[in-house]
Amino acid sequence: MIRVGIIGATGYTGLELVRLLKNHPEAKITYLSSRTYAGKKLEEVFPSTLENSILSEFDPEKVSKNCDVLFTALPAGASYDLVRELKGVKIIDLGADFRFDDPGVYREWYGKELSGYENIKRVYGLPELHREEIKNAQVVGNPGCYPTSVILALAPALKRNLVDPETILVDAKSGVSGAGRKEKVDYLFSEVNESLRPYNVAKHRHVPEMEQELEKISGKKVNVVFTPHLVPMTRGILSTIYVKTDKSLEEIHEAYLEFYRNEPFVHVLPMGIYPSTKWCYGSNHVFIGMQMEERTNTLILMSAIDNLVKGASGQAVQNMNIMFGLDETKGLEFTPIYP
């Protein structure tokens, strides 16, 4: 059994980790941490978890003694210093602290200096692209939700040099859970219900993460213009991506089928079928569709994921499976909830 700890167990991604790991045949939750609810049983605060473990303040000695792997489900900037205190424990960070190759990029977009970053061996945890590196990783930076949906949608086209990477336009829409459990007027029911609005236009922190990984795939400079929108639903991300090409839709579609042929969670839809967030609700599955706007030679890619599962906690469990030599679908085999 893999002994598992979770820091930030009472946020949305932390609670999703609890749900997934309680049903994992090879994992046992041995440590749960929450500053807000320290001293309480998790099921006292969230009865749906059916988990009677007592929440505690972060204690690096207890983590090192009781855990083989630690999931850190904390806001950006909160995990880095905690992780540096730990020895002999594998780390999967669901925040942004270990996603970037260049600490200067993190400093520019997140406003924090990561002292000693270059001494930490870390891997960007997108299994479909970095599976071999993840196998031997000690620290994994779990990808962001928007980058997961965008990178997986673009990877085959960029890898095969089928599109122009110079300007990639991304219009993405996310459910409110993507904002976390923080108290903010913008996320009150009356503010969100029956409303659709863009946010962080031209300055979203996920842009450099997308560009970093897409440039690795293409070997060329990539420019992403990204506009996210908040929609009145709980879960899900739908990303619509516009990119120039001189290839046919049939050639591109065939390349996608080949690229993802052996991937258990990525599904390339038949031409003319477009994804819905309802199809991946509560699951680790990704659905990708495409169409060609022939007047302008524009390829339109569409991807749907559950932001809390493949966009966060499910992908983290997938990474854990790979790190410990398990079938990466362990604990994630379930189909989406529908309707």
Swiss-Prot record:
Disulfide partners: none
InterPro entries in the record: AGPR_AS, AGPR_type-1, NAD(P)-bd_dom_sf, NAGSA_dehydrogenase, Semialdehyde_DH_NAD-bd
Enzyme category, top tier: oxidoreductase
Pfam families xrefs: Semialdhyde_dh (PF01118), Semialdhyde_dhC_1 (PF22698)
Molecular function, one GO term: NAD binding
GO cellular component, one term: cytoplasm
Residues forming the catalytic site: C145
Pathway: Amino-acid biosynthesis; L-arginine biosynthesis; N(2)-acetyl-L-ornithine from L-glutamate: step 3/4
Biological process, per Gene Ontology: L-arginine biosynthetic process
Catalytically driven reaction(s): N-acetyl-L-glutamate 5-semialdehyde + phosphate + NADP(+) = N-acetyl-L-glutamyl 5-phosphate + NADPH + H(+)
Keyword Transmembrane helix: no
HAMAP family per UniProt: ArgC_type1
Function field: Catalyzes the NADPH-dependent reduction of N-acetyl-5-glutamyl phosphate to yield N-acetyl-L-glutamate 5-semialdehyde.
Stated family: Belongs to the NAGSA dehydrogenase family. Type 1 subfamily.
Identification of the protein by name: N-acetyl-gamma-glutamyl-phosphate reductase
